[in-house]
């Protein structure tokens, strides 16, 4: 009788554990799909809205799917217009924009932090460690793709972790490589790197030339036309090859940096490109 009682209690306990396990699984799965649904809706708004709707109209739509955006909308007077516009074109920047009032006066980071030796790190122009800092007539988060791309290459090739996007941007701007109303000059790619110990050389656009440079361990910075990466102009870094496709570090997007890209997809979007090596 004692054994039967213990067995029944054990079965009841196992049933409870199984029941709550199922509840937790369903809850977690539901939350995952809900987050996926929200992200899809936000991406659809970003992809299908027009300039005629205005920044406020787009934010109002987006606020229906994320409480953080709703908070930004309710306190929009605390945010520069360029940051609000950034949010309407890149939902990855939600937390960066949200934290602006609290962190806008923080000093920029002195280093990029931990990196892996021999690898080109992914750095983002809207990283809170430097993204709120001024660059030209805006912020690094908004128009700092050039300095951030160069910073990735410098840190990866030289392991100089103090060559942050902010430090590269400061040097570039002081030496005339920021063009007001346009952004980073292409000359930055061949001229600025030498100060930080790297050399940039313009190379021809071609599948073979890109593959050869990457196989030699030479990262490539590309100036991009409107397309998958930008609606205006942008810089990205090609860091290597995998399964016949190109690995990209996009200073404005973690998601695009996680993808592998066919050369044919990138070819028509590349406006110019530079390969980089160390000077020493």
Descriptions of predicted regions:
Residues 30-66, 70-73, 110-111, 118, ...:
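Conserved active-site-adjacent core of cysteine acyl-enzyme catalytic domains
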Residues 2-3, 13, 20, 27-174:
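Active-site-adjacent structural segments surrounding the nucleophilic cysteine of cysteine proteases
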Residues 1-15, 280:
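Short, Lys/Arg-enriched, disordered terminal segments
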């Amino acid at each position: 009788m004692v054994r039967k009682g213990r067995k029944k209690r054990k079965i009841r306990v196992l049933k409870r554990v199984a029941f709550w396990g199922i509840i937790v699984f369903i809850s977690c799965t539901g939350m995952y799909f809900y987050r996926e649904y929200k992200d899809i809706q936000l991406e659809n708004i970003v992809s299908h809205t027009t300039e005629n709707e205005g920044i406020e109209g787009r934010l109002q739509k987006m606020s229906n799917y994320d409480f953080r955006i709703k908070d930004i909308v309710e306190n929009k007077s605390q945010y520069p217009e360029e940051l609000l516009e950034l949010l309407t074109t890149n939902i990855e920047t939600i937390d960066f924009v949200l934290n602006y009032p609290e962190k806008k006066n923080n000093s920029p980071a002195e280093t990029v932090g931990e990196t892996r030796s021999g690898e080109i790190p992914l750095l983002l122009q809207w990283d809170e460690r430097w993204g709120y800092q001024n660059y030209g007539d805006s912020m690094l988060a908004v128009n700092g793709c050039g300095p951030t791309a160069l910073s990735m290459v410098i840190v990866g090739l030289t392991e100089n972790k103090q060559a942050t996007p902010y430090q590269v941007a400061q040097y570039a701007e002081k030496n005339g490589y920021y063009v007001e109303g346009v952004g980073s000059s292409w000359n930055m790619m061949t001229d600025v790197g030498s100060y930080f110990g790297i050399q940039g050389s313009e190379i021809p656009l071609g599948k073979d030339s890109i593959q050869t440079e990457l196989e030699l361990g030479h990262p490539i910075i590309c100036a991009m036309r409107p397309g998958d990466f930008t609606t205006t102009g942008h810089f990205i870094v090609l860091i290597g090859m995998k399964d016949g496709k190109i690995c990209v570090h996009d200073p404005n997007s973690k998601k695009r940096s996680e993808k592998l890209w066919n050369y044919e997809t990138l070819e028509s979007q590349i406006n110019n490109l530079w390969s980089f090596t160390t000077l020493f």
